[in-house]
Amino acid sequence: MTKKQLHLVIVTGMSGAGKTVAIQSFEDLGYFTIDNMPPALLPKFLQLVEIKEDNPKLALVVDMRSRSFFSEIQAVLDELENQDGLDFKILFLDAADKELVARYKETRRSHPLAADGRILDGIKLERELLAPLKNMSQNVVDTTELTPRELRKTLAEQFSDQEQAQSFRIEVMSFGFKYGIPIDADLVFDVRFLPNPYYLPELRNQTGVDEPVYDYVMNHPESEDFYQHLLALIEPILPSYQKEGKSVLTIAMGCTGGQHRSVAFAKRLAQDLSKNWSVNEGHRDKDRRKETVNRS
């Protein structure tokens, strides 16, 4: 049996350079993540990892919050170099002293190495102590001019494999405005201006997934015109959402009760987008009226 390879990214670097954002980014990329791993525990932890999937991936923040960091890290890295079945890289996050000082002042936190309270002194000492580790790092990212979003994008470009790059998923959902707009929606579209099947007795108790209602909604000229404009708006911007590192884009179609018009539109949009993207279709309020009637 072929031994599975473990992929490890050790995230380290200057305090305030963005390690928290980085570890969150790795989690979004499908890595198992741990923040503030004591260096001495790292080899033992890797031995205890139960490999359940092909090519398991770990991202661990190892930094100077562990008091033994500087005395242990070199020996630990030497041990990892000789460990079979392990592919590991060091990601070092850095930033200019001026920017680090500004970030500390913004958060009103003290630097862990600033014994006398002077932030700049702590930064200079940390930079001196971390210089050998920075020189060993395969990936050095300067976050001085990067926003958190830009850092996430940078890490996604460097550490996403082909499968991860294609993991962008679209959630297309319908909802009723009377029950509130979905709090997780990224894009919200209102179709309440269209003719409402609710006022036709033969369609009232059906939903937009049923053919008679779907045909009634979509066969109106204004429905087709709006849908074509909607598709022309959404399709060109999807690659940009993916490029920005967004893992899930939620598109919500709303009508009054979330039973007829929005359901039909969400159904059609999901079908069309699924030709080129990974799409999930959902209808939050489709059966809400039926459930209310049954309870009464």
Curated annotation (Swiss-Prot):
Organism domain of life: Bacteria
GO molecular function: ATP binding; GTP binding
Keywords for the protein's UniProt record, in alphabetical order: ATP-binding, GTP-binding, Nucleotide-binding
A Pfam match: RapZ-like_N
PANTHER family reported for this sequence: RNASE ADAPTER PROTEIN RAPZ (PTHR30448:SF0)
Ribonucleoprotein is among the record's keywords: no
Similarity comment text for this entry: Belongs to the RapZ-like family.
Residues annotated as binding ATP: 13-20
Name of the protein: Nucleotide-binding protein SP_1566
Residue runs in coiled coils: none
Listed InterPro entries: P-loop_NTPase, RapZ-like, RapZ-like_N, RapZ_C
Entry function: Displays ATPase and GTPase activities.
Residues reported to bind GTP: 63-66
